């Protein structure tokens, strides 16, 4: 598991492939999926595998965001050191507790959460590198069955 590589490439794609010009996003909009990917990625997480309740973590594009959910709960995302250079997650806390997993569950978000990302310009190659930190993977499931 090398989440810092995803953090690097997610930011590269968002900066290179999306902008405010008429041709500001790549390819076909595909019923809103391309722009939805960008919005999720800018928040710092995105759904990768339909059929699971997991959102894979990247790195937020904003320093502070609040999502006011329909159920009255709020998701707060803070990344005060975030910048163009500081694209790597050094540490993440969820509701004030250190969090090493590379995914959030739908339930965590819907119950309201406070995510605090500590960002830096150097990748933390230890954070989220454990096998237990990896999100769902069908190929991982197949390996266990063998």
Positions of PLM-derived features:
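Non-catalytic C-terminal accessory modules of carbohydrate-active enzymes
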Residues: 1-146
């Amino acid at each position: 598991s090398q989440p810092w590589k995803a953090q690097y490439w997610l930011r590269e794609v968002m900066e290179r492939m999306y902008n405010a010009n008429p041709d500001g996003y790549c390819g076909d909009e595909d019923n809103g999926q391309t722009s939805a990917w960008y919005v999720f990625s800018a928040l710092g997480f995105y759904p990768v595998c339909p059929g699971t309740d997991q959102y894979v973590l990247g790195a937020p594009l904003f320093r502070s965001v609040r999502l006011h959910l329909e159920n009255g709960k709020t998701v707060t995302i803070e990344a005060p050191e975030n910048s163009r250079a500081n694209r790597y997650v050094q540490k993440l806390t969820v509701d004030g507790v250190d969090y090493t997993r590379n995914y959030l569950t739908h339930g965590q978000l819907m119950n309201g959460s406070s995510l605090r990302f500590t960002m830096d310009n150097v990748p933390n190659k230890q954070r989220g590198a454990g096998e237990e930190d990896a999100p769902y993977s069908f190929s991982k499931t197949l390996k266990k069955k063998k």
